[in-house]
Design a protein with these regions (language model features):
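Flavin-dependent oxidoreductase catalytic cores
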Residues: 1-230
């Protein structure tokens, strides 16, 4: 398009052919916060009951959260308080605009080492946003069963559930496939089980979970299978 991409700092990535992002100015940051707010307002006007602020998967909010992708020295960078300011200001602005009767969920990735997102910072981040007016927290774990190499055997779900208030429901997502996986995640402290891949191949997946032996077909899916998905 010829438009230079923007980010928290000047960054590049494999596949960008040497193109670097432009570090956002103070004006651009505040304008983007307003853009998130305007999007939430449109959702409310359209009849939705809430929005999820996507701070995971290396998208823009996530780029502000990472130590590697956010190397700013102003108030939008530095420690986790500074690096989370973009997200917290979005939460504050959206809540002010949509009122108390509209749900706000926040989604984060607990660990993305390439971006400089580490578990300790993510736990601190959750403590910060749990004190704000959010209604749900969504942790996108890539794999909810993964172990963290820190001598602590507790799952990511259990660690986050331990530090967030019981009044805030926890959604946990990543590599859940069958009913046993879902039950394990609930037992670890998730209030809601999030899925992606299995839901694409089996959109009626939740209706089969009552069967503890349910084993949905795994990828790769055939063209015929996907063509017949409701």
């Amino acid at each position: 398009t010829g438009v230079k991409p923007i980010s928290a700092s000047e960054n590049t990535e494999t596949g960008m052919d040497g193109i670097y992002t432009k570090a956002m100015t103070e004006f651009e940051i505040k304008s983007m916060i307003q853009s998130f707010t305007d999007a939430a307002i449109r959702c409310k006007k359209a009849g939705f009951h809430g929005v999820e602020l996507h701070g995971a998967h290396s998208y823009l909010i996530c780029q502000f959260l990472g130590q590697e992708t956010n190397r700013r020295t102003d108030k939008w960078g530095g420690d986790i308080v500074g690096r989370s300011r973009f997200l917290t200001e979005i939460i504050r602005s959206v809540r002010s605009a949509v009122g108390e009767d509209f749900l706000i969920a926040v989604r984060i990735s607990p660990i993305i080492e390439k971006a400089g997102i580490y578990l300790d910072d993510s736990l601190e981040l959750v403590k910060i946003i749990s004190e704000m007016e959010i209604d749900m927290l969504h942790i996108s774990c890539w794999d909810v069963f993964q172990a963290v190499d820190d001598g602590n055997d507790a799952s990511l779900t259990k660690r986050f559930r331990k530090i967030i208030p019981k009044t805030i429901p926890l959604i946990s997502t990543g590599a859940v496939w069958d009913s046993k996986d879902a039950q394990w995640l609930i037992d670890e402290g998730a209030d809601i089980v999030g899925v992606a891949r299995v839901g694409i191949g089996h959109p009626d997946w939740p209706s089969f979970l009552v069967d503890s032996n349910y084993q949905p077909q795994r990828p790769p899916f055939s063209v015929e299978h996907l063509a017949n998905v409701d």
